A protein has these predicted regions:
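Sec-dependent N-terminal signal peptides
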Residues: 3-13
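Non-globular, low-confidence helical/coil segments that flank catalytic cores
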Residues: 6, 17-334
Length: 334
């Protein structure tokens, strides 16, 4: 196994065979897990999480289909936000389909049950064959043409505000800690901010409210973003007004499943955020009802039994972007 510093890996970085004109992001339906493919203008690729294993290879096949649509034949960086089954479970099959140059994670597994140990051992068996990066808050992932900043990992968050950030957050006054907040691998999630010139997208994995609070209270260490990938599949234990109001997104993406994530309270908080125009969802959230789901054009998969359609976001240097729904070919520019 080679464990390299990010600086050393940057020196060794090479562009992939496919070169995108702009930043392209594919939000892949893995039924309430996560898998997001970033294709940089340089052609380098970052895959964040691999969805579930099992289900007759469902999620790796969907990842492969999105990669084919993007013209991607290899993964330069595979980032595993944490070691839960819905984020790392599909790795075995994904690794059979694509060469993976570097593996990024938060460090040791923190859950000691049998299944968690099996998943972590599976992950390390692949990571040890290549380049493994244990990323920490403040690190930069070396993808050409993008600034990919690690904001959270291994239970820690960014120590100081990013350049241009650091404004007081008035919503912090109403924050109340959740006495029932879980302590699990979710809290260890790697969270990243990707900047492409004037475009910024935030993805905090499965972080929940206390770590969101640490990133934006009493000072907003992040600043504002164009797009927010709703935390924890738009779960009720995350997506606090303290975070979402502070980052002031124009668009939110929910990587929810038909019966996982997409919680009404979280949806409403995001929906009511000043300046937000739209929420795009990977699935219609069955338990949330019409009042807490977006209109059909903004949902990639309406039926519970579906083909696993994806959403694609294309961002320009000037900060403008568009989102495309592969189910109905609907596209909207921002």
């Amino acid at each position: 196994m080679r464990v390299l510093s990010l600086c050393a890996l940057l020196a060794a970085s090479a562009a992939s065979l496919y070169a995108a004109k702009n930043l392209e992001i594919y939000f892949i339906d893995v039924e309430g897990g996560q898998s997001t493919l970033f294709v940089a203008p340089s052609g380098e690729t970052l895959l964040m999480d691999t969805g579930y294993g099992g289900f007759n290879h469902r999620d790796p096949e969907r990842i492969a289909a999105a990669a084919k649509a993007a013209g991607v034949k290899k993964i330069d960086f595979l980032l595993i936000s944490h070691y839960h089954a819905d984020h790392v479970g599909g790795l075995y099959d994904v690794a059979q389909k694509f060469p993976i140059r570097a593996f990024i994670d938060h460090g040791p597994n923190t859950e000691m049950d049998k299944d968690s140990k099996v998943r972590f051992n599976m992950y390390t068996s692949f990571a040890e064959k290549g380049t493994r990066i244990v990323a920490k808050p403040g690190d930069t992932i070396p993808i050409k043409s993008l600034d990919v900043k690690v904001l959270a990992g291994a239970g820690q968050t960014l120590a100081a505000p990013l350049p241009g950030a650091g404004q007081p957050n008035p919503d912090c006054a109403t924050y109340r800690p959740d006495p029932d907040e879980e302590t699990s691998e979710n809290q260890q999630s790697l969270g990243i901010l990707i900047t492409y010139s004037n475009f910024r997208i935030l993805d905090l994995g499965d972080l929940t409210s206390s770590h969101e609070h640490d990133l934006v209270c009493p000072l907003n260490k992040i600043g504002t973003v164009n797009v927010f990938v709703a935390s924890h599949h738009m779960g009720a234990a995350a997506n606090t007004p303290q975070l979402v109001h502070a980052i002031h997104p124009k668009v939110a993406i929910a990587d929810n499943g038909p019966r996982k994530g997409g919680k009404p309270q979280a949806w409403q908080t995001v929906h009511d955020t000043p300046g937000l125009e739209d929420i795009w969802q990977l699935h219609y959230a069955i338990g949330a009802g019409k009042d807490h789901n977006s209109a059909d054009p903004f949902i990639a998969n309406i039926e519970e039994q579906c083909e696993g359609k994806w959403l694609r976001l294309t961002a320009e240097k000037d900060g403008t972007f568009k989102v495309y729904n592969s189910r109905n070919k609907y596209e909207k520019s921002y």
